[in-house]
Amino acid sequence: MSQQQGKFIVIEGLEGAGKSSAIALVNDIIKQHIGQAPVCTREPGGTPLAEKMRDLVKIADETDPLCDEAECLLIYAARTQLIANVIKPALSVGQWVLGDRHNLSSLAYQGGGRGLMPLVKAVSDACLRGFKPDLTLYLDIDPTLGLSRAASRGELDRIEQQAIDFFERARRTYLQLAHEDDSIVVIDASQSMEQVHNDIGIQLQRHLSTLMSEQ
């Protein structure tokens, strides 16, 4: 009998949307349903080499500022490494994978926010070759509120320091892509954490039965 393929679930959202607590919740729900914890990843990053690329993207270097196109390519290099060495191997042996960001982030941030959508789509097509999550939960929040939450956690990284209009463009792109793809579920992250987690639980339970029946 052939090995059942695992499932790939991703949590997306702007800064301050509450991804970390949502990931912990989804991790617990998946564990309850399949009897084991999923493999957890983050992007950019998730492998030793990809983590080095993450540092290049996240940490500002005033002596050699990272241009937008290089930022995009570094993120896809890290993503391709993660898919090849972690995500696909796990899925192939029946493990589920829970991702903190994936390709939707690049479409929203580099495509929408940076205005590089043609480049993003071309690189995405070349690197991913149609690979995508089975389910994405997008935590939607107004950028002003999200950045206020992020700032309260401490020093902002290079991406978090972008102008508000960058995040507004990214948010519009997220919502447009969610409108076009039934595998992307929008969660109102401006609510209380309790209500957000309740909504996540409802949506995840609804989709888990379908995903498990497809194994």
From Swiss-Prot:
Write down the Pfam families for this protein, in alphabetical order. Thymidylate_kin (PF02223)
| PROSITE patterns reported for this sequence | THYMIDYLATE_KINASE (PS01331)
Which positions bind ATP? 13-20
This protein's GO cellular component annotations are: cytosol
Which chemical reaction does it catalyze? dTMP + ATP = dTDP + ADP
Enumerate the CDD domains for this protein: TMPK (cd01672)
Biological process GO annotation list?
dTDP biosynthetic process; dTTP biosynthetic process; dUDP biosynthetic process
Q: Which InterPro entries match?
A: P-loop_NTPase, Thymidylate_kin-like_dom, Thymidylate_kin_CS, Thymidylate_kinase
Enzyme Commission (EC) number? 2.7.4.9
A single GO molecular-function term is: dTMP kinase activity
Q: Which HAMAP family match?
A: Thymidylate_kinase (MF_00165)
Q: Which NCBIfam families does this entry report, sorted A to Z?
A: DTMP_kinase
The protein's role, per its UniProt record: Phosphorylation of dTMP to form dTDP in both de novo and salvage pathways of dTTP synthesis.
* Family assignment from sequence similarity: Belongs to the thymidylate kinase family.
Which protein are we looking at? Thymidylate kinase
Q: Which organism is it from?
A: Shewanella frigidimarina (strain NCIMB 400)
Please name the taxonomic classification of the source: Bacteria, Pseudomonadati, Pseudomonadota, Gammaproteobacteria, Alteromonadales
